Amino acid sequence: MNPVIKTFQFGQSTVTLETGRIARQATGAVLVTVDNDVTVLVTVVGAKQADPGKGFFPLSVHYQEKTYAAGKIPGGFFKREGRPSEKETLTSRLIDRPIRPLFPEGFMNEVQVVCTVVSTSKKTDPDIAAMIGTSAALAISGIPFEGPIGAARVAFHESTGYLLNPTYEQLAASSLDMVVAGTSDAVLMVESEAQELTEDQMLGAVLFAHDEFQAVIQAVKELAAEAGKPTWDWKPAVANTELFNAIRAEFGEAVSQGYTITVKADRYARLGELRDQAVAKFSGEEGQPSASEVKEIFGEIEYRTVRENIVNGKPRIDGRDNKTVRPLNIEVGVLPKTHGSALFTRGETQALVVATLGTARDAQLLDTLEGEKKDPFMLHYNFPPFSVGECGRMGGAGRREIGHGRLARRSVQAMLPAADVFPYTIRVVSEITESNGSSSMASVCGASLALMDAGVPMKAPVAGIAMGLVKEGDKFAVLTDILGDEDHLGDMDFKVAGTAKGVTALQMDIKINGITEEIMEIALGQALEARLNILGQMNQVIGQSRTELSANAPTMIAMKIDTDKIRDVIGKGGATIRAICEETKASIDIEDDGSIKIFGETKEAADAAKQRILGITAEAEIGKIYVGKVERIVDFGAFVNILPGKDGLVHISMLSDARVEKVTDILKEGQEVEVLVLDVDNRGRIKLSIKDVAAAKASGV
């Protein structure tokens, strides 16, 4: 087929969608070009048949940045791209979240989306281009999909308002970085970080993005009309209404009673018993439904039971009303040898969070398409299987853990001190020790507490809360502090983090259409109320950062020297600075402008290194008395070392008021003597005197 090209204006950018020239064996393939700078190839492949026995929709999204796109060659021994970076993993999740709910219920055919960045200008993030390309590739593929979607990034400035699809430079000066995706009539996904913006400003950004990306949706529809393949002839399995009614009649009341058990483990055990009874009664014999079909229908009964109870105003699973936060238990300083620690427990969700301070050398080195950069703040989230009472795989962080860690990082990052105020590298680790809903928001609260416990001068404490939604027809209920079951059975996962002043992070995933502005306003309002409640309880335990760092944390001393002294401190081949580090056990970082940061495991080590540097960089002061060591004796006098690397000459006539025949009559090499600096000439030569020391002392020098 001949290539089909569609070009449209998206804010200040010109976007081109092209299909039919590259990757023609994929089910759908689109080449997206933005401003002739960023080019992303997006392919979609769908299996024609479902894999029998899979009880989930096997959708996978892979976003990959090729180094050649930025004119670079990969590092490492093999000189080729390796495992996905954290940025690639996060972008893959960003694309997955808005498209997953748009595949029809019951569709189990495997679908794989691959987004490859093949060219970039290093000015803007290619993620929005990848999201647009995914929407277009799905729209033309013929795979059942209730799209297309649009996507946009929004920045915000107090003076200029909202800005569509900003550059990296514009984002750096912005108080908001938000990505929004959705259909023509609904927002499906929001991912953002902000600097204490109000709820109204955040909601305004969501609505602004939704209005702006309508241009994307229209262009994709036009491309699909011209180049789209016929929609697959797929029909969902016919629901077994008779079996559903039979199981509900037999077990509906028991399931309803099971969901009044407030302890998660006991509730799961009881519902598991009922599920096994249903399988035993309604399957197993010839002519009866399969066990998997019975389990699926039993799950549907659970789903409807919980949702009906909530929208009809009945108490939630654990007995709370819609606005109540679970009981909190907050501790700080729980680990004796760490730099800062906190144990944050909310109901059956618990996070042990630890903050560690390091030197500038501990910063993470990131090799990105834009170039190498150092990241002095890390927040890592771990979710071991024991946190939900299960056995499971132990190993490296998965996509979910990386995503939750990034959300927690976004939440607290805006409240960290500037590098010139607090030049430590900071690593926060959140160990989820119990989980029943919203462990990422527990990590936010725990991170804020641990950082303050470590003495990091936070601008303000931060707390987070997860909101949920159940909507049936015109009835809906917004839930504060959702449980794991409410997250699974609800229609929205809406996480808000911030300070008492404003929002620092907002993440939203919506599974249905019809989420109105009113519902989002209610959710933001309830989240604010809950956040202030949690902050109040956190402040009772630790209201502000400790004034001193932990005794276990490294001591940091900042100082500045003249730039022409840098080479003296470093020494030939780095010999001088290496010697200082080895002898004092401190680490030293020197910048080109003469700024020096000294990190010592103890205060004594840092002070010793500072004194060594001061000694090297100090200049001899005329009229000042020094205690020096005789380094060399010559016929006409003696050379005395008064500062590291600085020797002065005591002429034989300056040794004593009496006549001196031989220098060795008064001095010997290695002897310590007091000397007075008489003069320093324009070549840096120092003239010293021993005989004038007494008079100088008498005059008060």
From Swiss-Prot:
Molecular function per GO: 3'-5'-RNA exonuclease activity; magnesium ion binding; polyribonucleotide nucleotidyltransferase activity; RNA binding
Keyword Magnesium: yes
EC number: 2.7.7.8
InterPro entries given in the database record: ExoRNase_PH_dom1, ExoRNase_PH_dom2, ExoRNase_PH_dom2_sf, KH_dom, KH_dom_type_1, KH_dom_type_1_sf, NA-bd_OB-fold, PNPase
Catalytic activities: RNA(n+1) + phosphate = RNA(n) + a ribonucleoside 5'-diphosphate
Record PANTHER family: POLYRIBONUCLEOTIDE NUCLEOTIDYLTRANSFERASE (PTHR11252), POLYRIBONUCLEOTIDE NUCLEOTIDYLTRANSFERASE 1, MITOCHONDRIAL (PTHR11252:SF0)
The protein's required cofactors: Mg(2+)
Family in the record: Belongs to the polyribonucleotide nucleotidyltransferase family.
Chain positions recorded as Mg(2+) binding sites: D487, D493
Keyword Protease annotated: no
Residue stretches making up the S1 motif domain: 623-691
Cross-referenced Pfam families: KH_1 (PF00013), PNPase (PF03726), RNase_PH (PF01138), RNase_PH_C (PF03725), S1 (PF00575)
Function noted in UniProt: Involved in mRNA degradation. Catalyzes the phosphorolysis of single-stranded polyribonucleotides processively in the 3'- to 5'-direction.
Quaternary context: Component of the RNA degradosome, which is a multiprotein complex involved in RNA processing and mRNA degradation.
Organism in which the protein naturally occurs: Pseudomonas putida
Listed PROSITE patterns: KH_TYPE_1 (PS50084), S1 (PS50126)
Upper classification of the organism: Bacteria, Pseudomonadati, Pseudomonadota, Gammaproteobacteria, Pseudomonadales
Identification of the protein by name: Polyribonucleotide nucleotidyltransferase
